[in-house]
Amino acid sequence: MKFFVDTADIDAIRELHELGMVDGVTTNPSLIMKSGRDIKEVTAEICALVDGPVSAETVALDADGMINEGRELAKIADNITIKVPLTWAGLQACKVLSGEGRMVNVTLCFSANQALLAAKAGATFISPFVGRLDDLNMDGMDLIAEIRQIYDNYGFETEILVASIRSANHMKDAALIGADVATAPPGVIKAMANHVMTDKGLDAFMADWAKTGQSIV
């Protein structure tokens, strides 16, 4: 499963990238706002750092506006993925932009029907939001399993990009189901390294080592 990092924080991306943990990056208007930087400037810097797909989101609500914004964003770098919402206008924009050979990430997906439409429209990625479904007392991972089954049934090439990830368990579940990609905040990816038994075992080793009075260097 590929790891995308969901942030516009250059330092956080660089730290994970140096460990080989970044296969791509996703951004959205909220993350750009949080960065406090110009969208084209920060996106260009991310694209120069990361070889994989970098999602930059349109903000127009009509298809023509999304298409025009998508084409403009695509000028930033060759690895730009144009992000559009899963609305009818977004599907129209996806069809045009993907037909031009551009990568398109259709976002804000909350149903298998929506994911099926996105695949038919030529989406490169579909981004189902699991955390927000969990907030509604639904199991967001059930949606990932449904989409995986549908895409496998018909050989769709659209990649399932699990989004709105809140925990390391979300990452594990996405991998078990067979998602192609999971995008998560830097903190969630780093939290995957944590386990209480690892900490407990390390504490025991350090206590015993101290008793030896030895030094390795």
Curated annotation (Swiss-Prot):
It catalyses: D-sedoheptulose 7-phosphate + D-glyceraldehyde 3-phosphate = D-erythrose 4-phosphate + beta-D-fructose 6-phosphate. GO terms for cellular component: cytoplasm. The keyword Transferase applies. Its EC number is 2.2.1.2. Keywords: Cytoplasm, Pentose shunt, Schiff base, Transferase. Pathway: Carbohydrate degradation; pentose phosphate pathway; D-glyceraldehyde 3-phosphate and beta-D-fructose 6-phosphate from D-ribose 5-phosphate and D-xylulose 5-phosphate (non-oxidative stage): step 2/3. Its main location: cytoplasm. CDD domains: Transaldolase_FSA (cd00956). One of its GO terms (biological process) is carbohydrate metabolic process. The keyword Isomerase does not apply. It is found in: Cytoplasm. Belongs to the transaldolase family. Type 3B subfamily. PANTHER family: FRUCTOSE-6-PHOSPHATE ALDOLASE 1-RELATED, TRANSALDOLASE. Transaldolase is important for the balance of metabolites in the pentose-phosphate pathway. This is Probable transaldolase. The lineage of its organism: Bacteria, Pseudomonadati, Pseudomonadota, Alphaproteobacteria, Rhodobacterales.
